[in-house]
From Swiss-Prot:
pH-dependent activity: Optimum pH is 8.0-8.5.
Lineage of origin: Bacteria, Pseudomonadati, Pseudomonadota, Gammaproteobacteria, Pseudomonadales
Alphabetized UniProt keyword annotations: c-di-GMP, Hydrolase, Magnesium, Metal-binding, Phosphoprotein, Sensory transduction
Consequence of substituting residue 161 to A: 5.1-fold decrease in kcat
Gene: rocR
Record's function text: Phosphodiesterase (PDE) that catalyzes the hydrolysis of cyclic diguanylate (c-di-GMP) to 5'-pGpG. Cannot use cyclic AMP or cyclic GMP. Part of the RocSAR two-component regulatory signaling system (also known as the SadARS system), which regulates biofilm maturation, type III secretion and expression of the cup fimbrial-gene cluster. Negatively regulates the expression of cup genes by antagonizing the activity of RocA1.
Annotated binding of Mg(2+), by residue: 175, 233, 265, 295
Protein name (Swiss-Prot/TrEMBL): Cyclic di-GMP phosphodiesterase RocR
SMART domains, alphabetized: EAL, REC
Regulation: Phosphorylation of Asp-56 probably induces local conformational changes in the response regulatory domain. These structural changes are transmitted to the adjacent EAL domain, then the signal is further transmitted down to the active site. The phosphodiesterase activity is inhibited by Ca(2+) and Zn(2+). Phosphodiesterase activity is inhibited by a benzoisothiazolinone derivative that specifically inhibited RocR, but not some other phosphodiesterases.
Native source species: Pseudomonas aeruginosa (strain ATCC 15692 / DSM 22644 / CIP 104116 / JCM 14847 / LMG 12228 / 1C / PRS 101 / PAO1)
Listed result of changing residue 352 to Q: 61000-fold decrease in kcat
Pfam families, alphabetized: EAL, Response_reg
Length: 392
């Protein structure tokens, strides 16, 4: 572990002494200390940066919350460990605030301080620093000419991520996702090209390429005895096209596939200011027999409004609720409520982002039946997906 600057923010002198003494035994580098937020701000200004701030929340003078806000604005603090005993609901709200401020939350230290707990949190910090993916700078994104060339050369490929039954892993369907087989950079996810496509109105061209590839795969699945439903992501900009439903119908006819074999996923945020033509397209698709899914349900601010106004046949619950089940008790209440909502509306529910068996078991207890996530399968190219579906 490299040398670290660790700041202990604690107003109770004995607790601060215990923490500093323990940290000096296990942390290579400098251990700084402050009795309140004002002292901590002064330390930040003098030392340049702090790798980890161990922060008590309830202090006289400038408290921990005010210090965290200042730390975010200064850009001089990387990670935060809480050392306050607070109500679980307040704790979760504080964690959310820390993350919204752009700070990395490592965990709770609790009181009294434990050397074993400090060591575990330092190990977590080191692991996150090593594994943290580097943010893609705009300058590193491919040029529009490169993206257009890739589209013209057929370098964008449909990948498939299964939707499965939680209680047995049986295949229910799959989502079709985009990957770019770049000739020099290898397989690239959407984070490398979607921004350019959205900026230069290339999303529609990508959609039709993926849709054609997906329908060809769906026909092969039928031949394998696996006539499952495939879901395609529709960008909000496409919904205003009067020809969208008509062109989808034409391709389904060309591939001799029923409309019920496909579903279209639309994010809630993409429907906030949807024009009448968008609603017309969605109604036409549902009349044809296609499925419609509200993607990332719960991630925005108007999920229930959208669910009432648009003819959805499926809800895809945003992955954040699954990720927070263990640390935020209210997430479980939200999930069980969405289960009841889907049942009352007579539509299906897919839970996204399932990554552990512990999550799978808890979701079953909450009434969920269909899920998608790395626990079951990562997105895969066509041949791997066909092998997956045939059990080979």
């Amino acid at each position: 572990m490299n040398d670290l600057n660790v700041l202990v923010l604690e107003d109770e002198p004995f607790q601060r002494l215990v923490a500093v003494t323990a940290l000096k035994k296990v942390v290579p580098g400098s251990i700084l200390e402050a009795a309140d937020g004002k002292e901590a701000v002064a330390i930040l200004e003098s030392c340049g940066h702090v790798d980890i701030a161990i922060c008590d929340l309830q202090m006289s003078g400038m408290d921990g919350l005010a210090f965290l806000r200042h730390a975010s604005l200064s850009g001089k603090v990387h990670s935060v460990i809480l050392s306050s005993e607070v109500d679980p609901i307040l704790r979760q709200a504080t964690i959310s605030m820390i993350e919204c401020l752009g700070l990395n939350f490592l965990g709770d230290l609790g009181k009294p301080f434990s050397l074993e707990r400090i060591t575990a949190l330092l190990t977590r910090y080191n692991a996150r620093r090593q594994d943290l993916p580097r943010q893609i700078e705009v300058a590193e994104l491919p040029s529009v000419a490169d993206v257009v060339r890739g589209l013209d050369n057929g370098e964008f490929e449909a990948y498939y991520q299964p939707k499965v039954a939680l209680d047995g892993g049986g295949l229910i369907g799959a989502e079709v996702l985009a990957r770019w087989n770049h000739p020099h950079l290898g397989v690239l996810p959407p984070s490398h090209f979607l921004y350019v496509m959205e900026t230069y109105n290339l999303v529609d061209k990508l959609f039709w390429q993926l849709f054609s590839q997906g329908l060809a795969t769906r026909r092969k699945l039928a031949q394998l005895g696996q006539p499952i439903n495939l879901a395609f992501n529709v960008h909000p900009s496409q919904l205003g096209s009067r020809a969208l439903a008509e062109n989808i119908s034409a391709l389904l006819t060309e591939f001799h596939l029923p409309p019920s074999s496909v579903m279209f996923e639309i994010t809630e945020t993409g429907l906030i200011s949807a024009p009448a033509s968008s609603l017309e397209n969605l109604v036409r698709l549902r009349i044809m027999g296609c499925g419609l899914a509200m993607d990332d349900f719960g991630a925005g601010y108007s999920s229930l409004d959208r669910l009432c106004e648009f003819p959805f046949s499926q809800i895809k619950l945003d992955r954040t609720f699954v990720q927070k089940m263990k640390t935020q008790p209210r997430s479980c209440a939200v999930i069980s409520s969405v289960v009841a909502l889907a049942q009352a509306l007579g539509i299906s529910l897919v839970v996204e982002g399932v990554e552990s068996d512990e999550q799978r078991v808890r979701l079953i207890e909450l009434g969920c039946s269909i899920a998608q996530g790395y626990l079951f399968a990562r997105p895969m190219p066509e041949q791997h997906f066909l092998d997956y579906c045939s059990g080979s």
